[in-house]
Structures are given as C-alpha cells and as structure tokens.
C-alpha cells in the first residue's frame, strides 16, 4: 500500500536551523543567492567569488553566500468533541485519516510535527510536542478513532493558545467547527503570528440526506439529549438553509484572518489539498 501525502509550501522564510524543503534566512549550502561577504566574516573558501575579489580595489577576498532550505514546524489541532463522533463513518475516523496524511507529508518534507487533541479540556495524554521523529504524534493519531467523548463539548479551544509554538508554524486545525463563533475568533486572534489551515469536516447526513417526511429522533452528541421532531418539507429546507448560512459565515470569518477554510464532506483527496496550497500560499 502506497503512502499518501500532499505537497505543501510556505510563503514566509523559515527561521529553523534544521535542513528541510522551505525557503529560509539561514546561511548554508543552499542554491538561493543571498549576496557577498568578506572571507574573514564568512570563512568558506569553497564559495570564493574570484570575479568580485579581482574587482575590489582594497584587495579583499569575497565569498558568495546562499540561503539553505530549512524545515518548518507543523502542528495538528484535532477536535475530539462529541459532535465529531457523528456519522456511520464518524468524523473522527476521517480526522484520523487526514492527520495521518498530514504526518506523512511533514515527514516527506523533513519538517517537525506535533499534535494536540482537545474537547472541553486539553489533557496531557493528548499532547505530542513538535519533533522530527513523529512517533508520539503517530501514536495519538491511532487513538483518535477510539475516542468516545459523549457529552463533551469543545471549550478546550480556549486553551490551545498555550500550545502554540514560538516560531511561525503551519497549523492544520481539524474540526467540524460546531463551535461558538466567539471561541473560534479568540483562537484565531491568539494564532495571528501563525498560518492556520482550517479543515472543516461535515457529514451530508447532518443536513442534506434527511428523510423527506416522518417522525425522527435526534440526539445532540454534546448534551446527549434526545429530541423527537416531525420532519416536513419546510423544516428540512430550514435545516439546509442554516447549514448553508453557517458555511458562508465560516468562510467569511476564516478569510478575515487570512485562513481560507478547506471543507471535507466525503473522502479526503490529498491532491485537493495540494491545489489548496498552490492557490492560497504561493511559494
């Protein structure tokens, strides 16, 4: 079975010393020309520029300096709340699949990766710090599908700022974002120095594949309360309208923070994520 991954790039210069695949400010053995320096300041005889040296009236020896390609930190924030258990193939199963592909992509680019899972709180057992050896992140990804956080909400989003890395980080935020707008806005404000990619998991059975008529029982996954309602054409239309309005609002909210959302309402296609980066984050 082939390993799935997508191609991504960043539109800022990494500050990481660790070699990788992205543009950086670090001097090294790269191919991006950064200028000249005196040999005494940058003692690397392999980089002597004879033409520049011969033209200098002060007889100084010059070397060419280049920027190396560096790694960049990658974080996954994964919603583990009760609403993520919805569906015959739950959103958590889809989240685990996507997180695995993100991990593969980071490994392919030689980037450090970490993961934080949350529901109403952030537990220590759901924290994998940034590392170039993604064993802990991988072990948490395998646990995602077994989470059964009935009666758990997503208030832990208000604690995520404590786990934001110091340096500019590419953050993949996996959630259905059935989260109050104020809490989403607060997180985005706290994460302004980072680049956030919201991956929004919705299940069409939540709103579009409802029975056309009849009595049905809904269970709120976060309060665990049951409600019996009579489905009729007008109510179904209202439900669909509300979801469409919610989608428009999320797009507007995330775009206002330069964080275009990526919606997943079925199978996740890594190629679509590659196209997303090509469209929104030019190298």
Regions from the language model: what does each represent?
Residues 85, 182, 206:
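Conserved protein kinase catalytic core
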Residues 117-142:
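Short beta-strand-loop
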Residues 42-43, 134, 266:
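Solvent-exposed, conformationally flexible loop/turn segments
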């Amino acid at each position: 079975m082939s390993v799935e991954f997508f191609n991504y790039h960043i539109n800022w210069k990494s500050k990481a010393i660790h070699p990788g695949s992205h543009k950086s400010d670090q001097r090294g053995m790269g191919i991006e020309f950064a200028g000249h320096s005196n040999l005494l300041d940058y003692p690397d005889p392999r980089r002597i520029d004879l033409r520049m040296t011969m033209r200098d009236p002060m007889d100084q020896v010059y070397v060419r300096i280049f920027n190396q390609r560096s790694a960049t930190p990658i974080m996954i924030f994964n919603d583990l709340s009760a609403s993520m258990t919805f569906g015959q193939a739950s959103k958590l199963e889809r989240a685990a699949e996507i997180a695995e592909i993100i991990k593969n992509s980071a490994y392919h680019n030689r980037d450090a990766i970490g993961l934080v899972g949350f529901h109403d709180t952030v537990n220590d057992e759901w924290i994998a710090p940034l590392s170039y050896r993604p064993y802990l992140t991988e072990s948490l990804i395998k646990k995602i599908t077994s989470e059964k956080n009935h009666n758990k909400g997503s208030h832990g989003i208000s604690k995520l700022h404590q786990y934001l890395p110091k340096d500019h980080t590419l953050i993949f935020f996996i959630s259905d974002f059935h989260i109050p707008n104020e809490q989403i806005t607060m997180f985005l404000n706290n994460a302004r120095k980072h680049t956030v990619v919201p991956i929004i998991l919705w299940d069409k059975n939540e709103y579009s594949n409802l029975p056309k008529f009849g009595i049905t029982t809904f269970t709120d996954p976060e309060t665990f309360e049951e409600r019996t309602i009579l489905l009729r054409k007008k109510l179904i239309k209202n439900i669909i309208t509300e979801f469409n309005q919610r989608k428009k609002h999320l797009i507007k909210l995330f775009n206002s923070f330069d964080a275009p959302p990526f919606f997943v309402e079925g199978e996740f296609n890594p190629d679509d994520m590659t196209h997303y980066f090509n469209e929104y984050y030019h190298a």
